Amino acid sequence: MDRAADLWTLVSNFKNAAYDEQVHILQMLGDKLINDCRIEVFGVTIEPLWVEAYCYDETHFPDYNTHRSRKQKNRFGQMYFHERGYGGVDICLSNSEDFCLSFLLKATLANGHFLTQTQLPCVLLSTGKTKADFEHLEDILHPANARHTICHTTRVNLTKPCYSDAPLTSFALDAIPKYDFRFARKNLRENVRAYLLAYMAAHPDCTEQECRAECRRVFGWVPDLVRTWVHN
């Protein structure tokens, strides 16, 4: 599959890249998981809407927010069920024993139903299959032609400061007002602010009420800080 080959090539280029390029590669991988791939497992079709990159390379990318599980190494295109923390499912993209790399499926559509990180494993296990059954599957990434507008932000609920300011989340902007993304609102504030400032620059006579309506249209909610942003 050409798209899996594209992912593989990006992963292979990651290790020797400079930091800024590493972040860009992780963003590109996230973008491709959302727009170019769907996941097919035991009759469940998963469409990623919000994915977060977790990578650990001791020398080149020591992110201690990564679980550093053996299941995050050299299992390209396979699932990893979290062994600790909140619970969740990742897609491993590491193609080497030298480093961990996986993408948390933070928000998805599973057979058309919106699921958050902790809901997805419950739905998968309701099929009667075990975690091991899912983790043994190969070739689960299939071509998709989604046309989402992709944006980036920081990762949600990190427990360590490593790379906490890095925009290692890819998300489908057009999905935000359609589904319940309340878990992400803190991380989305900077995206809302940047969007609103650009909107006000393009519409210099807009009122606060118009700005609030635009925020609600695009992001599905209006942060408390909108009034401050508008009047400053």
Listing of model-derived features with the role each one plays in the protein:
Residues 1-232:
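A cross-family signal for N-terminal binding/gating loops and helix N-caps
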